[in-house]
Amino acid sequence: MTARLLIFISLFVILIPNVSSAQASSLSALEGMEILRKAFVGVNDFTAEITQEKQLSLMKRKIVTTGEVRFKKPDIFYMELNAPYASRVLLKDNSLTLKLPKEGIRQKLALPPEQGLARWFEFLDHPVKTLPAGFDIRAERRGGTIFLQITPREKGVMKALQLVFQQGGELRRLIIEENNRDKTVITFSRMKKNTGLSEKDFRLD
């Protein structure tokens, strides 16, 4: 999994935990981003359990892993996947560290400032009046379920990302489609907000 893809996962997992209800049967892209902005209200940290299903284009069977995610304002995100495909990711603003315990691999990347969490927090700190540059965004409501799809205009690893959540704010799934035809579906459960996470809860070792 590349650093850019991990950035997309971390950003949109972070944005959802406290999403407000959508009233309209259809949503504009601006309305969809405003729902994301409202997700920050009153949320200082959160944890959630995840199940990840990875469908590789060259394999018929899915690779299924479980794990957890953690987030703490203003800019720390952690994701851990359990064995047999164990990995840990720590993102602090634009500094990303990936650890593969079984392989003994540890990689650290300094991402461009515009790809860090601080930029997105600044963007979503006020009501959304314009869309972020470089993305096509679609939002819609089907019954009580909200769908938000984000497609980068610049061709890279990710083809599209879709969030599926209930209008009451419960995140259900994160779907990531890559240009190599790989597909990842992350399902969320047991989400807990404002649990009082500290710095020690975001250590890779």
Residue ranges: model-predicted function:
Residues 7-18:
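Bacterial N-terminal signal peptides
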Residues 68-118, 184-185:
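An acidic-aromatic
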Residues 64-66, 85, 157-161:
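Short, surface-exposed coil-to-beta transition loops
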Residues 50, 77-81, 96-99, 148-150, ...:
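Short hydrophobic/aromatic-rich beta-strand segments that constitute the beta-sheet cores
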Residues 25, 37-42, 47-49, 54-56, ...:
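Flexible, processing/modification-adjacent segments and terminal tails
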Residues 1-5:
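Positively charged n-region of N-terminal signal peptides that target proteins for export
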Residues 22-31:
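Cleaved targeting-peptide boundary
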Residues 128, 132-205:
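Gly/Pro-enriched, hydrophobic low-complexity segments
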